[in-house]
């Protein structure tokens, strides 16, 4: 695969109806801001079961045939999907985001420019402001805040917002990402724990903001139980370092 300036990596699992048009609209805005930077775009279908997904995917590719598709027949989780994309991608900067491009174009540019402009960062991680939690379901916001507290008190990381879905990294960051084992949502946390343990990796939090009108999903109790188990695994891994 040809090396590009930026690779955009996006997982997809049962996205909302009309996702393809929304993705194209947001992608068009972002692509214009990339200017003359070369890009690649990889979308991973992580075992989607909705009836209209293939139809929407066909429309997406008819409008933007350069997007590469990875098909996973069963749902393995966001972390597993992004690792699959990361294995295929070749770029100077790898940008991770969600299928609805929930963060503003300015936020995405800020994330990659901190790497592109030679700030010394290897991984840039979105840092969500307090008003973010007013825009998400109550239970999800409380769980996110509780996780941030746990990260400060139990994992002792230099920053507590590990779960923002908007991140970017260079090749050094990519190599650490490919070492992660967590398949679902807490892959971010494992990535940060591994990166902090490396002496030659620099992580920079970057302020980001949600787009207006974004509605985030509620989490099922099954997923919450799985993530609690994953947190304990990551905690044990951290304690062994």
Description of each model-found segment:
Residues 45-54, 101:
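A conserved acidic beta->alpha catalytic loop
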Residues 74, 80-88, 105-178, 185, ...:
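Acceptor/aglycone-binding surface of glycosyltransferases and processive sugar-polymer synthases
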Residues 94:
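Short aromatic/hydrophobic "clamp" motif used to bind/position activated sugar donors
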């Amino acid at each position: 695969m040809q090396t590009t300036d930026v690779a955009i990596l996006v997982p997809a699992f049962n996205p909302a109806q009309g996702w393809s048009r929304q993705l194209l609209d947001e992608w068009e805005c972002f692509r214009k801001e990339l200017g003359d930077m070369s890009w690649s775009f990889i979308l991973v279908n992580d075992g989607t079961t909705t009836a209209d997904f293939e139809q929407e995917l066909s429309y997406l590719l008819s409008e933007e045939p350069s997007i590469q598709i990875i098909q996973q027949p069963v749902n393995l989780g966001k972390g597993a999907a992004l690792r699959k994309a990361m294995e295929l991608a070749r770029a100077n900067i790898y940008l991770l985001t969600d299928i609805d491009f929930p963060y503003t174009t300015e936020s995405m540019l800020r994330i990659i420019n901190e790497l592109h402009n030679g700030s010394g960062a290897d991984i840039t991680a979105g840092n969500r402001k307090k008003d973010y939690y007013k825009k998400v379901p109550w239970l999800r916001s409380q769980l996110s805040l509780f996780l941030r507290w746990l990260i400060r008190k139990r994992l002792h990381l230099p920053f507590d917002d590990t779960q923002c879905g908007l991140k970017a990294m260079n090749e050094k960051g990519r190599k650490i990402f490919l070492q992660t084992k967590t398949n679902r949502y807490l892959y971010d946390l494992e990535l940060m724990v591994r990166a902090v343990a490396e002496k030659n990796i620099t992580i920079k939090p970057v302020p980001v903001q949600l787009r207006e009108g974004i509605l985030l999903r509620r989490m099922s109790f099954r997923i919450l139980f799985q993530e609690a188990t994953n947190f304990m695994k990551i905690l044990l891994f951290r304690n062994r370092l």
